[in-house]
Amino acid sequence: MSNPKQLTFPWNKYNKSSFDSFYASKLNKHLLSLLQNNTFKDDLLIFGTKDSGKTYLLQALCNYFSNQGKSSFYLPMKQAKELSVDILESLESMELVCIDGIESIVGNKVWEIGLFNLINRSLNSENRLIFTSSKNIDVMNFELKDLDSRLRKIQSHELYALADDEILSALKHIANLRSIELGSKEAQYLLTYANRNISDLVQILESLDQLSMEMKRKITIPLIKEVI
């Protein structure tokens, strides 16, 4: 198989995900510190709810590696499993492999074996594997017991979703990083009337920023009403 970074996949697209723009709550600061520690090279299994930011974090980690001139590969398992399991071949040659959503292949014998084989090959290389899942390994129930055993030996960390009282701080943090002027009243209005999912809020924020520039208007509550 060709070097993975030479191939084009439907999920490969430029993104600006970065650790700086990931709002780290108190509960997540230790995990963020581990991921940015170049001397910490253990494999990790990160689990958390749908809205905890697992995908963003993996993409930020890949960008972090790329910015240091290191090879990285991001694989969203839910999409990848529709392709041939051969996609896993040679991934151990990458310095970092991030596999997102491994719960998607529970019960899929071919993919469970493929993932198990990748982990085994990686034991003999210097690459690093980072997995994410919406569930703790204790409740995933992989049919391949050898895979289950391998994953249980990997250090696991929970990525906690933002608490309600942290969402406002996160929204302001992201707005400041992107030089978007968002007043306190406007931010509070967004939290009151829009979906409080941080990824949805960021999409709304980006739409507001674009619209405000096109209309040469500040982001106000009337403008927010036009978007949401």
Language-model region placement:
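Walker A/P-loop nucleotide-binding motif
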Residues: 40-58
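A short, basic N-terminal segment
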Residues: 1-37, 213-228
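Short glycine-rich substrate-engagement loop in P-loop NTPases that contacts/grips substrate
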Residues: 65-96, 106-112
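Short conserved motifs of the RecA-like P-loop NTPase core
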Residues: 181-194
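Conserved AAA+ ATPase "SRH/arginine-finger" region at the nucleotide-binding site
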Residues: 139, 154-166
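Conserved P-loop NTPase "ATPase switch" module shared by AAA+ and STAND
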Residues: 90-112, 118, 125-134
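Short regulatory helix/loop adjacent to the ATP-binding pocket of P-loop NTPases
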Residues: 137-152
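The conserved phosphate-sensing helix
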Residues: 194-208
